[in-house]
């Protein structure tokens, strides 16, 4: 089966330049991507998508729309679909941060206890992914896969041997 014409829209998280020479740039990346709730999905639906698609003739069908992310944007992609499956029905999360950075560790329990949503999920992680004060990424992704299986989601989980890097999903 051939893949239909596809348009990818990529968002770089904004940063605030350092105010002093040698200082660090600041970012709201973790607040925007790792937080649970509908805020980021609302931004995409109400502000971002209308701006980038105004001159494009796109199908208005959530079954034809997906969202992808890696690391913090991996959990962000899942959160957008979880909160708004009427807009995002397919999710790909590479080395997703389903750990306790800003509450993502609760997703396996939520998935098990909440009526299934009309989303398809692909998760991918590596055995040598992060293990730090926020949690253990391979274990967190395994817990996500187990919860999706328990709740009878259409999902796929692939565990490789890589670490926390952009080589995943490539």
Task: Describe every region a protein language model picked out.
Residues 1-170:
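Non-catalytic cap/lid and distal C-terminal segments of serine-dependent acyl enzymes
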């Amino acid at each position: 089966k051939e893949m239909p014409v596809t348009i990818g829209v990529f968002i770089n998280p904004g940063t605030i330049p350092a105010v002093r020479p040698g200082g660090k740039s600041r970012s709201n990346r973790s607040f925007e991507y790792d937080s649970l709730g509908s805020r980021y999905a609302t931004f995409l639906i109400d502000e971002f998508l209308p701006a980038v698609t105004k001159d494009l003739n796109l199908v208005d069908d959530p079954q034809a729309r997906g969202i992808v992310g890696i690391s913090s944007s991996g959990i962000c992609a899942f959160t957008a679909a979880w909160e708004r499956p009427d807009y995002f029905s397919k999710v790909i999360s590479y080395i997703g941060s389903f750990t306790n950075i800003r509450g993502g560790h609760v997703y396996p329990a939520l998935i098990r206890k909440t009526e299934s949503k009309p989303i398809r999920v692909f998760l991918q992680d590596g055995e040598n992914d992060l293990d730090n004060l926020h949690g253990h990424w391979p274990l967190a992704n395994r817990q996500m896969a187990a919860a999706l299986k328990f709740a009878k989601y259409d999902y796929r989980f692939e565990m490789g041997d890589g670490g926390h890097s952009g080589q995943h999903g490539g």
